[in-house]
Amino acid sequence: MTNLRKTHPLMKIVNSSFIDLPAPSNISSWWNFGSLLGVCLIIQILTGLFLAMHYTSDTMTAFSSVTHICRDVNYGWLIRYLHANGASMFFICLFLHVGRGLYYGSYMYLETWNIGVLLLFAVMATAFMGYVLPWGQMSFWGATVITNLLSAIPYIGSDLVEWIWGGFSVDKATLTRFFAFHFILPFIIAALAGVHLLFLHETGSNNPSGLCSDADKIPFHPYYTIKDILGVLLLILVLTSLVLFSPDLLGDPDNYTLANPLNTPPHIKPEWYFLFAYAILRSIPNKLGGVLALVLSILVLALVPFLHTSKQRSMMFRPFSQCFFWILVADLLTLTWIGGQPVEHPFIIIGQLASILYFLLILVIMPITSLFENNLLKW
C-alpha cells in the first residue's frame, strides 16, 4: 500500500515541502531563520488574536483597555508582553535572515528574494500600525510624525495625509483603521510567506558554498526538522526570558503615558527595529529627500541581485567582500544607535556619514570589490 502522505492531495503538499524535500547536506544554522520567522508569525497571530478579544480601538478607551488586559485578564500581561517582545524577536530573525541572504548570495533566486523584500515592507507596516494601538504618547506622536511624511509627496501630499488620518489629525478614525489593517496584514504576510516558499522550492535551497548541491541532497525530515526544533527552542528560551525578566527593556517609557496631542515628548523615536531607517530619514535636511531615502533604505535590497558582479555566488571564498559586508553590519548598528539619539552635534554628522556609507557600500563599493576579486582569480 502506498504511503498516505505521498498520495493524499493535501498531505502530499506538506510532504513535498517539509518531509521529503531534498535539501543540501551542508546548510548551516543561518538557514534556521526561515522556520523561526514562521514560528514568530504564528506566535504573533495567536497572541494578537487573544489581545484583539479585549482591546477596543477607540481613543477614549484604547489605553485603558490595554491596562485592563494587563491587570484583569487571565495571563493578559503575558499575552501582551509576548506580543510586544515577539515583534522584536521577529525583526531580529528578519534582519539575520536578510543578512544571510546577502552574505551567501541567496538573492540570485530573484522571485524568492523579491517576495522577501515585499514581506519585509509588509512586516514593517504591520509593526508600525501595531505600535500606534496602545495609544500612549509615543504611539500618537510616532503615528503623527510618520504619516505626516506623506505630505512631502508633491501635489497630492496634503490630501493623502488627511485621507489616511480620516480627518485633520491622528484621531479616532486613524486608530480604528490602523487596528483593522494591523489585524488583516499578518494573514496577508502568511499568504506571502507561502508564495515565498513556493518560489524557493522551485529552485531548492542555496548553501554556504554557493555551488550547485544537486549531487548531494538529503531529506528535510528528520535532519532539518530536528535542527529547526533546536532553533525554535532557543528562540522560545530568549523570548520567554525577555518577557518574564525584563518585558519593558525594548519599549519606551513614554508609552505608559496616555496620548496627549497638546504635549509633545522631547524625543520622538520609533521602536528599536526602525531606528536605522529613522536615522537615514533624519540625516537629510529636505523633507522629500528624507522620505525617498527612507523608502530606498529598504528598496535598495531589490537592486542587490542586479549589482552582483562576482563570478562566485557566495561570499564564503571572497575575503574582501566579507570585510565590506561586516563594515555594512557595523554601519547599520551605528545608524540604529544614532536613530535613538537627539538631533544635535555630533550625532547629526555621524548619522549623515553613516547614511552615505550605507548606500555607497551596497551600490558602489561591494560591486567594485567583486570585480576586483574576479581579477585576482584571473577570471
Curated annotation (Swiss-Prot):
Asked if the keyword Protein biosynthesis belongs to this entry, the reply reads no
Tell me which GO cellular component terms the UniProt record holds.
mitochondrial inner membrane; respiratory chain complex III
> Transmembrane residues, as ranges?
33-53, 77-98, 113-133, 178-198, 226-246, 288-308, 320-340, 347-367
What Gene3D superfamilies does the entry give? Answer: Cytochrome Bc1 Complex, Chain C
Localisation per UniProt entry:
Mitochondrion inner membrane
Q: Which residues bind heme b b566?
A: H97, H196
The cofactor note from the UniProt entry for this protein is: Binds 2 heme b groups non-covalently.
Q: Which UniProt keywords apply?
A: Electron transport, Heme, Iron, Membrane, Metal-binding, Mitochondrion, Mitochondrion inner membrane, Respiratory chain, Transmembrane, Transmembrane helix, Transport, Ubiquinone
**Which GO BP terms apply?**
mitochondrial electron transport, ubiquinol to cytochrome c
For the ligand (heme b b562), the binding residues are H83, H182
Q: Where does a ubiquinone bind?
A: H201
Which Gene Ontology molecular-function terms are recorded? metal ion binding; ubiquinol-cytochrome-c reductase activity
Keyword Membrane among record annotations: yes
- Give the similarity note: Belongs to the cytochrome b family.
General function of this protein: Component of the ubiquinol-cytochrome c reductase complex (complex III or cytochrome b-c1 complex) that is part of the mitochondrial respiratory chain. The b-c1 complex mediates electron transfer from ubiquinol to cytochrome c. Contributes to the generation of a proton gradient across the mitochondrial membrane that is then used for ATP synthesis.
* Record note on quaternary structure: The cytochrome bc1 complex contains 11 subunits: 3 respiratory subunits (MT-CYB, CYC1 and UQCRFS1), 2 core proteins (UQCRC1 and UQCRC2) and 6 low-molecular weight proteins (UQCRH/QCR6, UQCRB/QCR7, UQCRQ/QCR8, UQCR10/QCR9, UQCR11/QCR10 and a cleavage product of UQCRFS1). This cytochrome bc1 complex then forms a dimer.
Put simply, this protein is called: Cytochrome b
| Species per Swiss-Prot/TrEMBL record | Sorex isodon (Taiga shrew)
The coding gene here is MT-CYB
